[in-house]
Amino acid sequence: MYNYLDFEKPVADLDGKILELKKIFQEKGSLDMSDEIARLEKRSQTALNDIYKKLTPWQKTQVARHPDRPHFMDYSKRLLSDVTPLAGDRKFAEDEAIQAGFARFKGEAVAYIGQEKGHDTQTRLRYNFGSARPEGYRKAVRIMEMADRFGLPLLTFIDTAGAYPGVSAEERGQAEAIAQSTAATLRLKVPVVSVVIGEGGSGGAIAIAAANKVYMLEHAIYSVISPEGAASILWRDPARAKDAAMNMRITAQDLYRLKIIDGIISEPLGGAHRGKEIAIDATGEIISEALKAMVGKDGEVLKQERREKYLQIGRSLA
């Protein structure tokens, strides 16, 4: 059984009936319920299709946050081989919210940086729900500089509600660490490809997303602040997050129209959590195509194109 979101109730009801019939069929094999089960399965798929054809920005936010959605470690296991993770920022500590190191992608050496949220209570606490501290961003800069030194393409996977806002993080220079990470990305003379696989929240996301090519999964979100945060600022009421999401242009479709991202990666019907391998493989193909298009490009050209890409966003929206 899936973890159904509130707006998926019609599908949940139909799937519940299907399970009941299958259970009866198993207990009383003499009853042939295959036709009824097939009819309900068709209705369930139709209902799911109807719902996902017209998701609101707030509903997409819920899908992007789905507890069963594939996270960075799922992508790493399927897309990367010979993984060699590095730990620590060489200044203070290790931050597991950001996973980073070197690996092979389709046989080619790459550097990678990924934000990991965790799948259960234990791993969510371990990874701090994907909210990195300054040490995580300083570790990311370490990897970026090494990738640049060795001429390795950099792949980044974004999935965070935002950088950790705690007092301890602020004391250790959270804002400076985010700024330095963003600046380091813009200085690189190697191809950089970023994919927003779930949430792309605020500076915590942009710190590793200033890439030559930026893609989003179909139901991912990317914004300067979470809908709850925006609602708290605008209306002093986080309960109005739904209203904020409607006005923030946070969906992949909105951001592609605004030319902030370079492409949208299709998800299986019902979201990436309903077909993890399909979603991850589709992401791998997009990354591969993006890297091939940048093979042989001069490092200074890559750096300048990346810089112009972000300057153009401000100009085009002015």
UniProtKB/Swiss-Prot annotation:
Domain CoA carboxyltransferase C-terminal: 39-297
Cellular compartments annotated: Cytoplasm
InterPro entries from the UniProt entry: Acetyl_CoA_COase_a_su (IPR001095), ClpP/crotonase-like_dom_sf (IPR029045), COA_CT_C (IPR011763)
GO MF term set: acetyl-CoA carboxylase activity; ATP binding; carboxyl- or carbamoyltransferase activity
Alphabetical keyword list: ATP-binding, Cytoplasm, Fatty acid biosynthesis, Fatty acid metabolism, Lipid biosynthesis, Lipid metabolism, Nucleotide-binding, Transferase
Coiled coil ranges: none
Cited Pfam families: ACCA (PF03255)
Role according to the record: Component of the acetyl coenzyme A carboxylase (ACC) complex. First, biotin carboxylase catalyzes the carboxylation of biotin on its carrier protein (BCCP) and then the CO(2) group is transferred by the carboxyltransferase to acetyl-CoA to form malonyl-CoA.
Family indicated by similarity: Belongs to the AccA family.
Name of the protein this chain belongs to: Acetyl-coenzyme A carboxylase carboxyl transferase subunit alpha
Organism: Bartonella tribocorum (strain CIP 105476 / IBS 506)
